[in-house]
Amino acid sequence: PYPMRHHRTALPLAGYTIQQIDFDPATFQPEDLFWLPYHASLTGWGRKRQAEHLAGRIAAAYALREVGDKQLPAIGDQRQPLWPTPWFGSISHCGQRALAVVADRPVGVDIERRFTPQLAAELESSIISPAEKTALLRSGLPFPLALTLAFSAKESGFKATPAANQRALGFADFQIVEITASTLALMFAEQRYLLHWIASEEQVITLCALQQ
């Protein structure tokens, strides 16, 4: 049995299944963490962070089950999930929602709350270059939505990038070159990343699975 009260939804996107967990942190009890083999390392965390972490790992467990693996990801020295061989995976959180996806290749998933016009104006220069803004405006999407997608896509692209290359990376290393009604193209170190996205009125989700 899975701990903490939650509701699972399977979201198909680009041939993958994202496991979405909507959870109620008010139902979280510290003993719920005993479900995780490494629970002792989480005891110093605040309750909210513990609940979010647990929700992400519940999503990860469902995602691994989807591919026939009953293990849970271990935890790395940066608190990152360590996926069982031969799988790659990714986890993301936003409010009372957590997502996870597992794939046979490097993969990144990200969920973000949609920017308001005011927030988009404040954050624009820290997320995109003038050249990228041209690509966003060409998409025909409302600018706050396009900027949220750009931010989320760079997060997903970063997560899909091999860990050895991640350390010195920032947003400027990923360039948005195109956004369509369902995809987004990024350039990173002369590689083209093709991402897929979906949006609701409140949130966006981006998925980056690298070509093998």
Where are these regions (language model features)?
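Core catalytic alpha/beta fold that binds nucleotide/phospho-ligands
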Residues: 1-212
